[in-house]
Amino acid sequence: MPEGDAVFLTARRLDRALAGQQLTRTDFRWPSLATVSLAGATVLRTATHGKHLLTRMQHDGRELTLHTHLKMEGRWRTIDVGRKWPAPVQDVRVVLTSAQKEAVGFRLAIVELLPTADEHTVIGHLGPDLLATDWGEEHETEAVRRLLADPDRPLGEALLDQTTVAGIGTIWLAETCFVSGVNPLAPVTAVKDPVRLLRRARQMLRTAVKESRPVTTGDKRNPLWVYRRHREPCRRCGTTLVAGPIGDEGQQRTTYWCPSCQPEVGGDP
């Protein structure tokens, strides 16, 4: 599933193609919106909150938001008008066309149109967005409060829970826990400095946006410390990395760690 940085970069691409432009045609291949036309609407911008995309526009004197979510297989592509779509037609869920550019949403998991004033109904339950441009002390305090709300919960589960903080997926879970010296299966109480851990997660996400790809080691040739490096040597100590499931049965994800650098108890963020 695309994580917060990838969704943020998707929003940037949509903005480059459509922000400030008037839509000449729209096509919603989604049952609840099949008869909707937003032709004539002016796209303002696409914002994000964690893994959620919020394309805001003005139409007939109203401010509307197109809320989409990529989940596992969804993606947005922007192309010149008239160019062939880069994926099968049957996968198309949304088409937004301006005079020169077209944004096509493939296999989107969520597509809904709502008044911009009602965005809280679809993202209000989420934790603070680690890539929020106005991130400040208030966001950090709330993120820490949510993280510590269930101190016995496995840290990895808490970080993957978008109601704790928004934007972390399996990449940033594994990498944040590694650089913080905490095992992802350890309880939240194993984190000695939750503020520092969250700041590290935020900085890594910001770096990924800057580099347009996840890079946590500082080396673009070997960009990640532990993610998807099961059975490979730790880049720090040489110990063989391990992988294991995290989360409730039926919703388990795979995470990665170093048994030496990330003991099951303790940690030193």
Regions found by a protein language model. Give the residues of each.
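Structured catalytic/nucleic-acid-binding cores of DNA maintenance enzymes
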Residues: M1-P269
